Structure formats: structure tokens, C-alpha cells
Amino acid sequence: MDERTGRQIMSGFRLNLREGLGRAIDHGSKINFTFDGKNYSGRVGDTLASALMANGVSIVARSFKYHRPRGIFSAGSEEPNALVTVHSGARTEPNIRATELELYEGLEAKSQNRWPSVNFDVMAVNQLPGKAFSAGFYYKTFMGPSRPGHKATQFWWFCEQLIRRAAGLGKGASQADPDKYGRMNAFCDVLVVGSGAAGISAAERAASAGAKVVLCDESAAAGGALLSSSELLDGAPAHDWVADRLAELAKNKNVTVLTRTTVQSMFDDNTYLAIERVADHVKTPGKHQVRQRAWNIRCKSAVIATGAIERPIVFAGNDRPGVMLADSARRYVVEYGVSPGRAVCVFTNNDTGWLAARDMAKYGVIVETIVDVRKDVPDAIRAA
């Protein structure tokens, strides 16, 4: 709450959508979903994270040990906080990042590691004796001396049961998974991991030389950071440049583009394992459709073009809801048309914080303050 104006500044909301804003979503659509049993709506193209933010949901989880409130911190696979459980029964799947979960009609998601609710968690009492709960405290605190007829290990076994109930995040299903899974083998000259500017350019260059190329990206849409960029590439807006290049790659029979595909392991002899989320963006897979597919990719060479992850500035309370990465906040504004709050303060030590503030202000977000730890900020950045 802003003490001066009385406005709620921490809760997100959907901006007035217009051309150039909300590039990833269908402005005229509506998708119904539930979070912790409450009904909400979003747009086609939303992630669960962007839809929750648009509906003003600020607390989405609780921390592992102290059960401190957690909000959405990022916009991609680096998200540490917004872990949810989806589906029910035998299809229950815990620890899914809300930032990667594509919204679909009828989605049912639940927060984790809280009781009875994420907004009122009884286990938050753990914050009171927090200093006594140092890392590994249970390995010494409950190891009492042996007594006749009562061994120390027996006392630990008793305490261990209680600790295990309090530990962990989501709970998995106990029944057999009813979904189907597939496997594919692929052989190529060049594997490109990541479809930003570097990845697309590498795929283009290799394909133009006659090489067989596989281009993988973990997101639903290729383009990486360019999809929310306001910069120009070859005289065109970055997202238009991406669309043009992907259209050209699609015409080349030697190029395979795999979206929703995470390259997660590298083995000997240039062999890579990738997991494609074939039907995780729908409520249930089709009758003969696999839910996920494992790709064993053998290549002659690989280009790792996965980009960079913004590092947060460390300060007391930076784990609280309402604190998030600046570039991620910009992504929510530009790609999903969602403001992270009624008013924003940008805390930065480099130029990208100023550029994020510029883009957010351009689309109607109130940027109250920019705090830069540097003594000298380039005039060109201030002017931007």
C-alpha cells in the first residue's frame, strides 16, 4: 500500500491492450482456469504466471523452510518461487513452474507447501525461531544422548517422521501415470540450442551452407528475448525480424524447429537428450497422442545459444512478493500486457534496468523511481 495515495501498488493487473502490447496473447479471447479452487480467467497465449498476475494474485507459494510468502520472480525457466501442482488423481504433477505452464481451458492448479492456504500458512510460525533453524539443525538438535532402553537413534526416527511431513514441496501421485510418452532419434549436422538472435542466425548460416539443422527452444514460441525487445534488427522491429527469419527457415527442408523442447543433457560423441512437451498445453492429450517426447539427437557440432539470465541484486527482503527481475517485469508488460504493480521502482546497477523502465513506462506502467548504484550513469541512458 502506498501511504501517500492509498493505492495498492504490489498487485498486478492487465493493461489496456493495444497494438504492440500483449504480443504473445490473443486480445479477444478468454480462458477459464482455477488456482487453489478459485475461478479466474486469462487469454490465449498467457502463462499461468501472467494470468495470475493479471488477476492480482501476488502470493503464489511459500518458502521451503520458513514458509515466507513467495511471489512471481521471473518469466521463464529460471523461476524459483512459483511452483504449482497441476491435474489431479493419477495425472497429478507437482513442482511445475507457473512461468512455463501455458494456460488452457479448464486448467486446475494449486499452490504448494502451505496449510491451510497460501495466504494464511500456519507453518509460517517457523519464522519466529528462525535463527535456531540453521542449515542442517535437525542432524544435531534431535541426536540426544543414549539412555538405558532408549537409544538416540530411536528418538531421531521419531523426530524424522515429523520433519519429513513438514519438508518437501508438492506431492506426487501414488497411482500409475495413465499418459503415453514417445521417443525419437534425430541425426543432424548442427544442433542449435536457443532461438534468440544468435541461435536463429547460427541456424540460418548453417542451413545456407547445406547443413542439416535442428533448432530447439524451450518456449512455446521461438525468438527468445527478441519477442519483448523494442530494438530494431536490420531496420525492422525485433519480433518482426524473428517472424521473417523463422518463415525462411520453415521453407528449408533441412531445418527442423522444435519449440516447447528443452535440451537437458549432453553425452559422449555429441549426443544430446531433449524433452518435447507435446501436449502439456492442453487439458488431456488426444487418444493416440503422447504427452511428452524424448529426443535423442546425434549431431556433428552444436551451438549453445541459450542467452543469459538476469542476476538479482541482493538486499534484505528481496524474496518477498512484489520483488522481481526487471527484465522479467518488462516481458510481462510487453508480451502479456500485464503490469507487475500499480507503481514500479527499478533498482539496478546497469543500463538494462533503465531500458526496462523505459519500455514499461511506454505502455502505461507508472515508474515511480529508478535507483542506480553507479555514480555515473551515461547521459544517453538517462535520455532513453
Describe the predicted segments one by one:
Residues D2-A384:
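Residues forming the flavin
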